[in-house]
Amino acid sequence: MIIDQGRDPRLQLDDAEPFRIDSAEVTRDIERSTLTNIILDGDAFSLPVGARVTLWTGSNVVFVGKAVDEHHVLDLLSTETDDELTGDEVI
């Protein structure tokens, strides 16, 4: 699924404020979901490896995961166990 300008996409890294992006692609399958092809100002956006990444459309969260490299985010269900989450977060 491609999230483009028409859906007001914003990216949030860890606890920072979300910022607008041009587009991103979410791929979902039975085993995992990934966020890729993040475009900012017409160029591929490089993610900080290990960062928690949240994709918003308007006021809705579409995807939450961890950056496994500079251009791929894997969903939290595939990267974390309840023991590894902080505070009151639960999968």
Spell out what each predicted region is.
Residues M1-V49, D75-I91:
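Juxtamembrane "anchor/assembly" segments of surface/extracellular structural proteins
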Residues T54-E89:
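Short beta-strand and beta-hairpin "edge-sheet" elements
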